[in-house]
Amino acid sequence: MVQRLLLQQKTADPHPKLPGTIYTAAEEIVEAGGEALPVICDIRSEDNVRDAVNQAVDHFGGIDICINNASAIQLTNVTDTEMKRYDLMHQINGRGTYMVSKFCLPHLKKSDNPHILNLAPPLDMEAKWFAGTVAYTMAKYTMSMCVLGMAEEFKDMGIAVNALWPRTAIATAAVQNHLGGDEIMKLSRTVEIMADASYEILTKDSKEFTGNFCIDDIVLYESGVKDFTKYASVPFGELMPDFFVPDSTPLPDEIKNS
Protein backbone atom coordinates (compact mmCIF):
# COMPACT_ATOMS: atom_id res chain seq x y z
CA MET A 1 0.00 0.00 0.00
CA VAL A 2 1.41 3.38 -1.00
CA GLN A 3 1.01 5.90 1.79
CA ARG A 4 0.83 9.64 1.11
CA LEU A 5 1.53 11.53 4.30
CA LEU A 6 1.59 15.15 5.41
CA LEU A 7 4.07 15.59 8.27
CA GLN A 8 3.62 18.57 10.59
CA GLN A 9 6.26 19.85 12.96
CA LYS A 10 6.86 23.20 14.63
CA THR A 11 10.47 23.50 13.48
CA ALA A 12 12.93 21.92 11.08
CA ASP A 13 15.80 22.43 13.52
CA PRO A 14 17.23 19.30 15.16
CA HIS A 15 16.23 18.83 18.81
CA PRO A 16 19.11 18.36 21.27
CA LYS A 17 17.47 15.25 22.78
CA LEU A 18 15.20 13.95 20.02
CA PRO A 19 16.69 12.29 16.93
CA GLY A 20 15.92 13.38 13.38
CA THR A 21 13.86 16.17 11.86
CA ILE A 22 10.65 16.41 9.87
CA TYR A 23 12.78 16.09 6.73
CA THR A 24 14.61 12.94 7.80
CA ALA A 25 11.23 11.42 8.70
CA ALA A 26 9.98 12.29 5.22
CA GLU A 27 13.05 10.65 3.69
CA GLU A 28 12.34 7.43 5.60
CA ILE A 29 8.77 7.38 4.30
CA VAL A 30 9.97 7.83 0.72
CA GLU A 31 12.59 5.10 1.15
CA ALA A 32 9.81 2.77 2.35
CA GLY A 33 7.86 3.41 -0.85
CA GLY A 34 5.53 6.16 0.31
CA GLU A 35 5.14 9.83 -0.48
CA ALA A 36 5.64 12.57 2.10
CA LEU A 37 5.01 16.30 2.27
CA PRO A 38 6.88 17.88 5.21
CA VAL A 39 5.31 21.14 6.42
CA ILE A 40 6.54 23.39 9.21
CA CYS A 41 3.49 24.01 11.39
CA ASP A 42 2.92 25.31 14.91
CA ILE A 43 -0.16 23.34 15.92
CA ARG A 44 -1.17 26.21 18.22
CA SER A 45 -1.54 28.57 15.25
CA GLU A 46 -4.89 28.60 13.45
CA ASP A 47 -3.27 30.05 10.32
CA ASN A 48 -0.49 27.43 10.34
CA VAL A 49 -2.89 24.52 10.72
CA ARG A 50 -5.29 25.79 8.09
CA ASP A 51 -2.39 26.30 5.68
CA ALA A 52 -0.99 22.81 6.35
CA VAL A 53 -4.37 21.21 5.66
CA ASN A 54 -4.73 23.22 2.46
CA GLN A 55 -1.25 22.17 1.34
CA ALA A 56 -2.14 18.52 1.91
CA VAL A 57 -5.31 18.85 -0.15
CA ASP A 58 -3.52 20.72 -2.95
CA HIS A 59 -0.65 18.21 -3.05
CA PHE A 60 -2.49 14.91 -2.58
CA GLY A 61 -5.97 15.79 -3.80
CA GLY A 62 -7.76 15.21 -0.50
CA ILE A 63 -7.56 13.84 3.04
CA ASP A 64 -8.64 10.33 4.05
CA ILE A 65 -7.05 10.07 7.50
CA CYS A 66 -6.25 12.53 10.27
CA ILE A 67 -3.91 11.27 13.01
CA ASN A 68 -3.60 13.48 16.08
CA ASN A 69 -0.31 12.50 17.69
CA ALA A 70 1.09 15.90 18.73
CA SER A 71 1.42 16.11 22.51
CA ALA A 72 3.27 18.00 25.19
CA ILE A 73 4.09 16.24 28.45
CA GLN A 74 5.20 17.28 31.91
CA LEU A 75 4.61 14.85 34.75
CA THR A 76 4.56 17.28 37.66
CA ASN A 77 2.20 17.91 40.55
CA VAL A 78 0.14 21.05 41.04
CA THR A 79 2.81 22.84 43.07
CA ASP A 80 5.56 22.20 40.52
CA THR A 81 3.59 22.83 37.32
CA GLU A 82 4.22 26.31 35.95
CA MET A 83 1.23 27.89 34.27
CA LYS A 84 3.15 28.28 31.02
CA ARG A 85 3.60 24.49 30.96
CA TYR A 86 -0.09 24.00 31.78
CA ASP A 87 -0.99 26.30 28.89
CA LEU A 88 1.40 24.55 26.50
CA MET A 89 -0.02 21.10 27.23
CA HIS A 90 -3.60 22.26 26.76
CA GLN A 91 -2.81 24.31 23.65
CA ILE A 92 -1.11 21.37 21.93
CA ASN A 93 -2.94 18.32 23.25
CA GLY A 94 -6.53 19.46 23.50
CA ARG A 95 -6.87 22.57 21.37
CA GLY A 96 -4.49 21.28 18.70
CA THR A 97 -6.38 18.00 18.33
CA TYR A 98 -9.70 19.81 18.13
CA MET A 99 -8.45 22.34 15.58
CA VAL A 100 -6.70 19.87 13.25
CA SER A 101 -9.79 17.65 13.27
CA LYS A 102 -12.05 20.64 12.61
CA PHE A 103 -10.06 21.86 9.61
CA CYS A 104 -9.75 18.34 8.15
CA LEU A 105 -13.48 17.72 8.50
CA PRO A 106 -14.67 19.25 5.17
CA HIS A 107 -12.15 17.11 3.30
CA LEU A 108 -12.81 13.93 5.28
CA LYS A 109 -16.46 14.19 4.28
CA LYS A 110 -15.37 13.57 0.67
CA SER A 111 -13.41 10.39 1.47
CA ASP A 112 -14.70 6.86 0.91
CA ASN A 113 -13.34 5.62 4.25
CA PRO A 114 -12.50 8.62 6.45
CA HIS A 115 -10.83 8.18 9.83
CA ILE A 116 -9.65 10.39 12.68
CA LEU A 117 -7.30 8.63 15.09
CA ASN A 118 -6.19 10.30 18.32
CA LEU A 119 -3.25 8.97 20.31
CA ALA A 120 -5.20 9.31 23.52
CA PRO A 121 -6.13 7.17 26.52
CA PRO A 122 -9.41 5.63 27.60
CA LEU A 123 -11.49 7.97 29.76
CA ASP A 124 -10.89 6.08 32.99
CA MET A 125 -11.92 8.44 35.79
CA GLU A 126 -9.87 6.86 38.56
CA ALA A 127 -8.29 9.42 40.90
CA LYS A 128 -4.92 7.65 40.66
CA TRP A 129 -4.51 8.87 37.07
CA PHE A 130 -4.98 12.49 38.15
CA ALA A 131 -3.13 12.77 41.45
CA GLY A 132 0.39 14.06 40.88
CA THR A 133 -0.14 14.84 37.18
CA VAL A 134 -3.41 16.78 37.12
CA ALA A 135 -2.40 19.17 34.32
CA TYR A 136 -1.08 16.46 31.99
CA THR A 137 -4.00 14.11 32.62
CA MET A 138 -6.50 16.87 31.92
CA ALA A 139 -4.72 17.69 28.66
CA LYS A 140 -4.61 14.08 27.45
CA TYR A 141 -8.21 13.45 28.46
CA THR A 142 -9.24 16.46 26.40
CA MET A 143 -7.98 14.53 23.37
CA SER A 144 -10.05 11.57 24.56
CA MET A 145 -13.14 13.72 24.97
CA CYS A 146 -12.71 14.81 21.35
CA VAL A 147 -13.08 11.14 20.42
CA LEU A 148 -16.17 10.70 22.56
CA GLY A 149 -17.93 13.76 21.18
CA MET A 150 -16.76 13.78 17.57
CA ALA A 151 -17.49 10.08 17.06
CA GLU A 152 -21.13 10.74 17.90
CA GLU A 153 -21.28 14.05 16.02
CA PHE A 154 -19.68 12.67 12.84
CA LYS A 155 -21.40 9.26 12.89
CA ASP A 156 -24.03 10.15 10.31
CA MET A 157 -21.26 11.48 8.04
CA GLY A 158 -19.56 8.08 8.06
CA ILE A 159 -16.40 9.52 9.62
CA ALA A 160 -14.77 7.25 12.20
CA VAL A 161 -13.18 8.81 15.27
CA ASN A 162 -11.21 6.47 17.52
CA ALA A 163 -8.45 6.55 20.12
CA LEU A 164 -5.38 4.33 20.40
CA TRP A 165 -3.25 3.94 23.53
CA PRO A 166 -0.41 1.56 24.45
CA ARG A 167 -0.68 -0.94 27.29
CA THR A 168 3.02 -0.48 28.06
CA ALA A 169 5.68 2.15 27.75
CA ILE A 170 6.85 2.59 24.15
CA ALA A 171 10.55 2.91 23.31
CA THR A 172 10.63 6.48 22.03
CA ALA A 173 13.07 9.30 22.66
CA ALA A 174 10.38 11.13 24.64
CA VAL A 175 9.98 8.16 26.99
CA GLN A 176 13.73 7.88 27.33
CA ASN A 177 14.09 11.57 28.17
CA HIS A 178 11.09 12.00 30.47
CA LEU A 179 10.59 8.66 32.20
CA GLY A 180 13.94 7.18 33.09
CA GLY A 181 16.55 6.75 30.38
CA ASP A 182 17.91 3.47 29.05
CA GLU A 183 16.43 1.35 31.84
CA ILE A 184 12.90 2.37 30.87
CA MET A 185 13.66 1.58 27.23
CA LYS A 186 14.40 -2.02 28.23
CA LEU A 187 10.94 -2.21 29.84
CA SER A 188 9.20 -0.86 26.74
CA ARG A 189 7.75 -2.22 23.54
CA THR A 190 8.92 -0.92 20.18
CA VAL A 191 7.07 1.71 18.16
CA GLU A 192 6.07 -0.95 15.61
CA ILE A 193 3.25 -2.17 17.86
CA MET A 194 1.54 1.22 17.67
CA ALA A 195 2.11 1.42 13.91
CA ASP A 196 0.62 -2.03 13.34
CA ALA A 197 -2.35 -1.33 15.61
CA SER A 198 -2.97 1.98 13.84
CA TYR A 199 -3.02 0.18 10.49
CA GLU A 200 -5.62 -2.28 11.76
CA ILE A 201 -7.87 0.54 12.96
CA LEU A 202 -7.48 2.75 9.89
CA THR A 203 -8.30 -0.04 7.44
CA LYS A 204 -11.62 -0.85 9.13
CA ASP A 205 -14.93 0.38 7.72
CA SER A 206 -15.35 3.90 9.07
CA LYS A 207 -19.12 3.49 9.20
CA GLU A 208 -18.85 0.44 11.43
CA PHE A 209 -15.86 1.08 13.70
CA THR A 210 -16.04 4.40 15.54
CA GLY A 211 -16.07 5.77 19.07
CA ASN A 212 -13.64 3.15 20.36
CA PHE A 213 -10.86 3.57 22.92
CA CYS A 214 -8.41 0.94 21.72
CA ILE A 215 -5.43 -0.62 23.48
CA ASP A 216 -2.62 -1.53 21.07
CA ASP A 217 -2.13 -5.22 21.86
CA ILE A 218 -5.86 -5.91 22.12
CA VAL A 219 -6.36 -4.49 18.62
CA LEU A 220 -3.66 -6.79 17.27
CA TYR A 221 -4.82 -9.80 19.30
CA GLU A 222 -8.31 -9.43 17.87
CA SER A 223 -6.81 -9.22 14.37
CA GLY A 224 -5.02 -12.54 14.83
CA VAL A 225 -1.65 -11.72 16.39
CA LYS A 226 -0.80 -14.21 19.14
CA ASP A 227 2.97 -13.72 19.61
CA PHE A 228 3.99 -10.30 20.90
CA THR A 229 7.66 -11.01 21.56
CA LYS A 230 8.62 -9.25 18.32
CA TYR A 231 7.42 -5.98 19.83
CA ALA A 232 9.42 -6.25 23.06
CA SER A 233 12.71 -4.40 23.44
CA VAL A 234 13.76 -7.41 25.54
CA PRO A 235 11.71 -10.49 24.52
CA PHE A 236 9.94 -12.13 27.48
CA GLY A 237 11.29 -9.38 29.73
CA GLU A 238 9.35 -7.30 32.20
CA LEU A 239 7.22 -4.52 30.71
CA MET A 240 6.35 -1.21 32.36
CA PRO A 241 2.60 -0.49 32.28
CA ASP A 242 1.63 2.82 30.72
CA PHE A 243 -0.49 5.45 32.41
CA PHE A 244 -4.28 5.46 32.06
CA VAL A 245 -4.84 1.79 31.14
CA PRO A 246 -8.00 0.75 33.03
CA ASP A 247 -7.64 -2.11 35.51
CA SER A 248 -10.52 -3.83 33.72
CA THR A 249 -8.62 -4.06 30.40
CA PRO A 250 -8.53 -7.72 29.23
CA LEU A 251 -5.15 -9.47 29.29
CA PRO A 252 -5.25 -12.70 27.24
CA ASP A 253 -2.57 -15.28 28.05
CA GLU A 254 -0.95 -14.84 24.64
CA ILE A 255 -0.30 -11.19 25.47
CA LYS A 256 0.61 -11.80 29.11
CA ASN A 257 3.15 -14.50 28.29
CA SER A 258 5.00 -12.60 25.57
Q: Language-model features: where?
A:
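Catalytic loop of short-chain dehydrogenase/reductase
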Residues: 109-157, 165-170, 176, 180-181
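Hydrophobic positions on the long internal alpha-helix
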Residues: 52, 67, 100-104, 108, ...
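Conserved glycine-rich Rossmann-like NAD(P)H-binding loop of the short-chain dehydrogenase/reductase
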Residues: 1-24
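A glycine-rich helix->loop->beta "capping" turn
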Residues: 32-37, 55-68, 74, 160
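C-terminal helical subdomain
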Residues: 163-164, 181-258
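The beta1-alpha1 cofactor-binding region of Rossmann-like NAD(H)/NADP(H)-dependent oxidoreductases
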Residues: 19-23, 40-52, 83
